[in-house]
Amino acid sequence: MAKRQLNRRQNWRIEKIQNERAARAAKREQHALQELEGGDLGPEQLGLVIAHFGVQVEVEAQDGEFAGQVFRCHLRANLPALVTGDRVVWRAGNQGIGVIVAQMPRSTELCRPNNHGQLKPVAANVDLIVIVFAPAPEPHPNLIDRYLVAAEHAGIRPLLLLNKADLINDENGPALHALLEVYRDLGYPLLEVSAHHGDGMQRLQQMLDGHISVFVGQSGVGKSSLVNSLLPAADTRVGDLSEWSGQGTHTTTTARLYHFPNGGDLIDSPGIREFGLGHVSRDDVEDGFIEFRDLFGTCRFRDCKHDREPGCALLEALEDGRIKQQRMNSYRSIIASLPEDSY
């Protein structure tokens, strides 16, 4: 059945109701915060945001008498938006409730535009972004390259992870191996695992230890299954592939940080089908294609669009095999998707 289209008045009414609900929730939160701060609060101490629930977050105490304990915390109104992975200064209150009073500087942040095109951080202080894909749903090089550009732009080291390796067969194997070979030749770290059978999981754990990692990738590639295999106590819900669309059903609804036994953390974030890059410039995209970097600026024409122009360094590199057609297609697609003012 086709989805019913709403008229302008209906959309306005829905937005009005949502804004009113948000205002009431904010008012209740402010009242609770005032009551909390009116009582006895403990000293300032360091904490780590391990989950975010709208107007409240879960904070794990990093020092002091409460080290290792988790508190549900209110946010002071003057704080910037916090995300999982943020380091904060907080004060403990009564009944396991606390107040966050300051945000510590971030070493990195992973951002994506929201539905309104506004830039929104989704994880903080991450130093390893694990790009997960699988034989099914069919991996899209363009999406993988978007994640790689985002990782390069954020200064976060990427790891390409092929999950469900047990599903590789004679039919999909040649295309998958050709896909992997492109990234292997570029020097990107790459690992094949099966969360279901356990193949390669010990090696994955070793590569994650000592890092703050985040798993990204389209729904249905097994991110939740990977978390359950690495951390059985996490009990992340798993969704099956939709039989109708072949795409994954979204399962994880809240970004949460988990600790590995041997050190390091993992942030499990909601599944993303399309990762927007509207917040990056053309220069950022060009820098994100690592094998293209030395070629930009060497074309015959300064305003070369790398399409059909004579003397184009990218086209010459494409012709002699120094860059792959797959990557060239992704580059053109990503550049075409940027807002005009990004040029």
Swiss-Prot record:
Question: What does the record give as EC number?
Answer: 3.6.1.-
Q: Which domain of life is it from?
A: Bacteria
Could you tell me what the cofactor note in this record states?
Answer: Binds 1 zinc ion per subunit.
The answer on whether this UniProt entry bears the keyword Hydrolase reads yes
Write the record's keywords in alphabetical order, separated by commas: Cytoplasm, GTP-binding, Hydrolase, Metal-binding, Nucleotide-binding, Ribosome biogenesis, RNA-binding, rRNA-binding, Zinc
PROSITE patterns from the entry? ENGC_GTPASE (PS50936), G_CP (PS51721)
| Primary residence | cytoplasm
Q: Where in the cell is it found?
A: Cytoplasm
**Name of the top EC class for this enzyme:** hydrolase
Required cofactor(s) = Zn(2+)
Residues annotated as binding GTP? 163-166, 217-225
Concerning its family, UniProt says: Belongs to the TRAFAC class YlqF/YawG GTPase family. RsgA subfamily.
Q: Which PANTHER family match?
A: SMALL RIBOSOMAL SUBUNIT BIOGENESIS GTPASE RSGA (PTHR32120), SMALL RIBOSOMAL SUBUNIT BIOGENESIS GTPASE RSGA 1, MITOCHONDRIAL-RELATED (PTHR32120:SF11)
Function of this protein?
Answer: One of several proteins that assist in the late maturation steps of the functional core of the 30S ribosomal subunit. Helps release RbfA from mature subunits. May play a role in the assembly of ribosomal proteins into the subunit. Circularly permuted GTPase that catalyzes slow GTP hydrolysis, GTPase activity is stimulated by the 30S ribosomal subunit.
Q: How does it assemble?
A: Monomer. Associates with 30S ribosomal subunit, binds 16S rRNA.
Name of the protein in its database record = Small ribosomal subunit biogenesis GTPase RsgA
Write down the species: Pseudomonas putida (strain W619)
User: According to the entry, what is the taxonomic lineage of the organism?
Assistant: Bacteria, Pseudomonadati, Pseudomonadota, Gammaproteobacteria, Pseudomonadales
